[in-house]
Amino acid sequence: MKIGILYGGQSAEREVSFSTGKAVFEAIIDDNKVEMILLDGEISLILNKLKEFDLIFLALHGGEGENGIIQQFLENHNILYTGSDPIASRLAMDKSASKKIALKNDILTPSWHEIQIQHGNYEMPDRREIKYPNVVKPNEEGSTMGLSIVKDVSQLQAAIDLAANYSNYILLEEYIPGTELTVGILG
């Protein structure tokens, strides 16, 4: 099987993608024909290259690599790839939507408030409802990009400003101490 490992991209998580791509390459090289494919611009520019492979392993992180855009492009061109389909990818990268789906399915998730920034302005949740410590993070990023743990109100504005560098949609989430786990949910 000829496998192309697609890595790079334009998101804030680009460097994480380089590490993932290398790790995947080293893990599967023995039994397969494997080639690294750097995404360093528009995906359409490498369409012919992508069509040379039996399977594209998505080693992209963040942005269009995880939000369904690349997945939809590959499906539109009948290119097999690893990972979730475009709709599941969009939902998974939207933390707020994912949390709402989890709650509807009786899966516990830390409580949260949403802040939407429009033209540099936003409305804060009622300060009496904000508990500390909390986690402030962009709705659509991963790999802790733009994430802050806020211990008290004096740190809140700087955390919102940092998260706003990555998204106009920000979550203030209850902080739960312990080991962070990432899990897949099937079904």
Regions of interest found by a model, annotated:
Residues 1-93, 97, 116-125:
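ATP-binding N-terminal substructure of ATP-dependent carboxylate-amine bond-forming enzymes
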Residues 17, 112, 133-159, 180-182:
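Glycine-rich phosphate-binding loop of ATP-grasp-fold ATP-dependent ligases
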Residues 94-115:
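Short, glycine-/small-residue-rich phosphate/pyrophosphate-handling segment
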Residues 80-81, 109, 134:
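Hydrophobic beta-strand scaffold residues
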Residues 123-136:
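Acidic/histidine-enriched active-site and ligand-binding environments that engage anionic O-linkages
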Residues 151-187:
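Phosphate-binding site of ATP-dependent enzymes
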